[in-house]
Amino acid sequence: MLVWTNSKQGTFTSEEKETIVIANNGETTVTTSDTPFITKVIKLYEESLDIQVLYYGISSTTGEKYPTEVRVVIPKGRYVSLRSLKSKSTENNS
């Protein structure tokens, strides 16, 4: 899961308990290779954060990892699970 816990910095915690921090300039300052990470901060609002997240899925046929990028808005203090990100990436983009 990703959770946005700080509206000023944009601190994320993944389901593996790794931390991803978005600095005030919108750049990713801390990432890990085995967890989702932020590729773009689209807009930082007072109560939500609009971002693009990159994570790796595993192909059911080949077993290989593949990158998936999806745009998601995270309300302040709320969790977003990878399962919900995956389902959103298959929906039509509006």
Model-inferred region functions:
Residues S81-S94:
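Basic DNA-binding region of bZIP-type proteins
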